[in-house]
Amino acid sequence: MKIIEGNLSLKGDEKIAIINARFNHIITDRLVEGAKDAFLRHGGKEENLSLILVPGAFEIPFALKQACESKKFDGICCVGAVIRGSTPHFDYVAAETTKGIASVGLGANVPVSFGVLTTDTLEQAIERAGSKAGNKGFEAMLTVVEMLNLIQKIKA
């Protein structure tokens, strides 16, 4: 059986976008730094990395759709942070952001990763943005890198 699997190495000419929700920027700035770090560590060049800023997580799917349609990017890494509050707002934003990214991602012709934190507390978000639980922005970028490689191997 032939196994087709991506790896974590970039050629250096891949153009990648990070879409970042500014809301909860104390968390999302760390996710962006993690994503950028992963991109550079695995062979990407900073001049090939674009940062698209949106107001909040709910706006990520629309920006993602526009970025995919532009055909300027080989892959797109989505990051944000939705932290539960005392109202049901969290449930709506988290669910619709997730559905929107998944929907656009399935229709895209480029890899799209989901690095949007959905946590119950600020402490949980901090843990996932570079402290105890690693950096989910870094992990989301690794997903883009691996999927780029996988697509190239599938098409070869």
From Swiss-Prot:
<keyword id="KW-0808">Transferase</keyword>
<feature type="binding site">
    <location>
        <begin position="57"/>
        <end position="59"/>
    </location>
    <ligand>
        <name>5-amino-6-(D-ribitylamino)uracil</name>
    </ligand>
</feature>
<keyword id="KW-0686">Riboflavin biosynthesis</keyword>
<feature type="active site" description="Proton donor">
    <location>
        <position position="89"/>
    </location>
</feature>
<dbReference type="GO" id="GO:0005829">
    <property type="term" value="C:cytosol"/>
</dbReference>
<protein>
    <recommendedName>
        <fullName>6,7-dimethyl-8-ribityllumazine synthase</fullName>
        <ecNumber>2.5.1.78</ecNumber>
    </recommendedName>
</protein>
<feature type="binding site">
    <location>
        <begin position="86"/>
        <end position="87"/>
    </location>
    <ligand>
        <name>(2S)-2-hydroxy-3-oxobutyl phosphate</name>
    </ligand>
</feature>
<comment type="pathway">
    <text>Cofactor biosynthesis; riboflavin biosynthesis; riboflavin from 2-hydroxy-3-oxobutyl phosphate and 5-amino-6-(D-ribitylamino)uracil: step 1/2.</text>
</comment>
<dbReference type="InterPro" id="IPR036467">
    <property type="entry name" value="LS/RS_sf"/>
</dbReference>
<comment type="function">
    <text>Catalyzes the formation of 6,7-dimethyl-8-ribityllumazine by condensation of 5-amino-6-(D-ribitylamino)uracil with 3,4-dihydroxy-2-butanone 4-phosphate. This is the penultimate step in the biosynthesis of riboflavin.</text>
</comment>
<dbReference type="Pfam" id="PF00885">
    <property type="entry name" value="DMRL_synthase"/>
</dbReference>
<feature type="binding site">
    <location>
        <begin position="81"/>
        <end position="83"/>
    </location>
    <ligand>
        <name>5-amino-6-(D-ribitylamino)uracil</name>
    </ligand>
</feature>
<dbReference type="GO" id="GO:0009349">
    <property type="term" value="C:riboflavin synthase complex"/>
</dbReference>
<feature type="binding site">
    <location>
        <position position="128"/>
    </location>
    <ligand>
        <name>(2S)-2-hydroxy-3-oxobutyl phosphate</name>
    </ligand>
</feature>
<dbReference type="InterPro" id="IPR002180">
    <property type="entry name" value="LS/RS"/>
</dbReference>
<feature type="binding site">
    <location>
        <position position="23"/>
    </location>
    <ligand>
        <name>5-amino-6-(D-ribitylamino)uracil</name>
    </ligand>
</feature>
<dbReference type="InterPro" id="IPR034964">
    <property type="entry name" value="LS"/>
</dbReference>
<feature type="binding site">
    <location>
        <position position="114"/>
    </location>
    <ligand>
        <name>5-amino-6-(D-ribitylamino)uracil</name>
    </ligand>
</feature>
<dbReference type="GO" id="GO:0009231">
    <property type="term" value="P:riboflavin biosynthetic process"/>
</dbReference>
<comment type="similarity">
    <text>Belongs to the DMRL synthase family.</text>
</comment>
<dbReference type="GO" id="GO:0000906">
    <property type="term" value="F:6,7-dimethyl-8-ribityllumazine synthase activity"/>
</dbReference>
